[in-house]
């Protein structure tokens, strides 16, 4: 018998918000079921309309605030209500931090079945113009005879929010979005550019144009003039990631750079490389991680998911030796390049399958007193399941997903004999629900 799909009640409803979901949506309890409403805050009475009805939960669209929360602030961005670039601008900066810290501790309790002995003070940065990496979608609209440049719409990712500014993006891009749109509007093939990747170093900003078809000579000339006038490095990507090349200046080397001034280290990176989005917060994060490691001159440290050496190189200045292991061979080459340019010789880097700890052990074949783990959103499940083969006395875990951190914490604490000494959030992405965190584990 075919299930009957519940009908949407399209009349406006009123509800009181009792909590926030992990992604920052307000939660109302109606007839024993959770209803998620984007843009609503705890304590508020809101008017909303159902947009989705499921067996276990419903979703609604916020229509108006009947009783506002004292935590509510006016969003800075004029595109905020539609744009999917961020989701918490309606919440005060202080409350955003409290929400993220509470979310982390709740997940550690619920899925990690533990709590840290102490909670770290949150790491924060300037909340605006912090985002040094982004992907902007573009689309030429025939009916309007104009180009849309922006992030995907929050409630309908098939569509692009046309933006004239973005207060979370690097300040140069924030200012120049309108000029980017004008550039594409003047091109002969206005459908050619599908997206624009933004990557900023400390002193330069690069744009990667994903061109679906070869550029005409006239369009190449227009892009060069744009890059020259507004001072950008421009890369083209005619195919896959391996096809990216520096288009302007033609004689420029392909790298951007950022500095960790506390350690007198400068990193060079390709615009396609993974680097932290928020430079100010990254500097604070590296410093905190090294403090938590409590490095001694005799320590040999293993840095897993080491990337281009963001933690490895500064740690190497405080210990005997650092071994960095990374799954991406290109990043291993970049890490060696950065070690050489910074005259750091007590580091080695290897490419390995980080789901196979025995491969890592056989590759490096040494003992480690301390380990730093900085995995992707999927976490470090295989690493923590096989941590006995490394047996470090201290682990610092840097996480970009509190759910997988909580899962891995459960294994480390309840199966492997480690103690969760401390943990806390690092607000790498202000005005979004994204939670970056750091945790210290000590062998019990």
Swiss-Prot record:
EC class name: transferase
Transport listed as a keyword: no
Q: Which GO terms describe its molecular function?
A: 4 iron, 4 sulfur cluster binding; iron ion binding; RNA binding; rRNA (uridine-C5-)-methyltransferase activity
Known Pfam families for this protein?
TRAM, tRNA_U5-meth_tr
Listed under catalytic activity are:
uridine(1939) in 23S rRNA + S-adenosyl-L-methionine = 5-methyluridine(1939) in 23S rRNA + S-adenosyl-L-homocysteine + H(+)
Q: Which residues form the active site?
A: 400 (nucleophile)
> Which InterPro entries does the UniProt entry name for this protein?
23S_rRNA_MeTrfase_RlmD, MeTrfase_TrmA_AS, MeTrfase_TrmA_CS, NA-bd_OB-fold, SAM-dependent_MTases_sf, TRAM_dom, U5_MeTrfase_fam
Sorted alphabetically, the Gene Ontology BP terms of this entry are:
rRNA base methylation
Residues spanning the membrane: none
What is this enzyme's EC? Answer: 2.1.1.190
UniProt-listed PANTHER family: 23S RRNA (URACIL(1939)-C(5))-METHYLTRANSFERASE RLMD, RNA M5U METHYLTRANSFERASE
Family affiliation: Belongs to the class I-like SAM-binding methyltransferase superfamily. RNA M5U methyltransferase family. RlmD subfamily.
Q: What does this protein do?
A: Catalyzes the formation of 5-methyl-uridine at position 1939 (m5U1939) in 23S rRNA.
Note the NCBIfam families from the entry. PRK13168.1, rumA
What protein name applies here?
Answer: 23S rRNA (uracil(1939)-C(5))-methyltransferase RlmD
State the species of origin.
Legionella pneumophila (strain Lens)
What gene name does this entry carry?
rlmD
């Amino acid at each position: 018998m075919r299930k009957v799909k519940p009908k949407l009640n399209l009349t406006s409803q009123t509800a009181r918000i009792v909590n926030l979901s992990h992604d920052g949506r307000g939660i109302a309890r109606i007839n024993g079921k959770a209803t998620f409403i984007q843009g609503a805050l705890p304590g508020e009475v809101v008017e909303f309309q159902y947009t989705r009805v499921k067996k276990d939960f419903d979703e609604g669209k916020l229509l108006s605030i009947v009783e506002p929360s004292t935590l509510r602030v006016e969003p800075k961005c004029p595109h905020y209500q539609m744009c999917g670039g961020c989701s918490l601008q309606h919440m005060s900066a202080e409350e955003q931090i409290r929400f993220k810290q509470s979310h982390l501790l709740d997940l550690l309790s619920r899925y990690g079945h533990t709590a840290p002995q102490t909670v770290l003070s949150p790491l924060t940065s300037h909340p605006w113009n912090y985002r040094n990496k982004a992907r902007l979608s573009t689309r030429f609209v025939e009916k309007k005879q104009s180009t849309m440049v922006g992030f995907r719409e929050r409630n309908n990712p098939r569509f692009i929010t046309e933006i004239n500014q973005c207060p979370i993006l690097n300040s140069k891009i924030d200012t120049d979005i309108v000029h980017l749109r004008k550039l594409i509007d003047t091109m002969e093939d206005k459908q050619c550019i599908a997206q624009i990747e933004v990557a900023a170093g400390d002193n330069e900003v690069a744009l990667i144009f994903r061109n679906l078809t070869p550029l005409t000579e006239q369009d190449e000339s227009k892009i060069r003039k744009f890059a020259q006038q507004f001072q950008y490095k421009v890369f083209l990507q005619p195919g896959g990631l391996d096809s990216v090349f520096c288009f302007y200046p033609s004689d420029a080397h392909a790298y951007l750079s950022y500095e960790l001034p506390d350690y007198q280290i400068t990193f060079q990176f390709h615009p396609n490389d993974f680097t932290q989005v928020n430079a100010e917060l990254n500097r604070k994060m590296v410093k905190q991680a090294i403090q938590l490691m409590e490095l001694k001159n005799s320590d040999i440290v293993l840095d897993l998911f080491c990337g281009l050496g963001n933690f490895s190189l500064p740690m190497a200045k405080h210990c005997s030796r650092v071994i960095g292991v990374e799954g991406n061979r290109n990043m291993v080459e970049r890490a060696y390049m950065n070690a050489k340019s910074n005259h750091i010789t007590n580091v080695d880097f290897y490419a390995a399958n980080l789901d196979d700890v025995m491969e890592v052990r056989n590759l490096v074949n040494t003992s480690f007193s301390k380990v730093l783990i900085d995995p992707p959103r999927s976490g470090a499940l295989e690493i923590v399941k096989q941590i006995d083969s490394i047996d470090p006395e201290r682990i610092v875990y840097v996480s970009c997903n509190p759910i997988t951190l909580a899962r891995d914490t459960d294994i480390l604490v309840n199966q492997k004999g480690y103690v969760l000494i401390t943990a806390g959030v690092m607000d790498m992405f202000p005005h979004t629900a994204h939670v970056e965190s750091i945790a210290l584990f000590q062998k019990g």
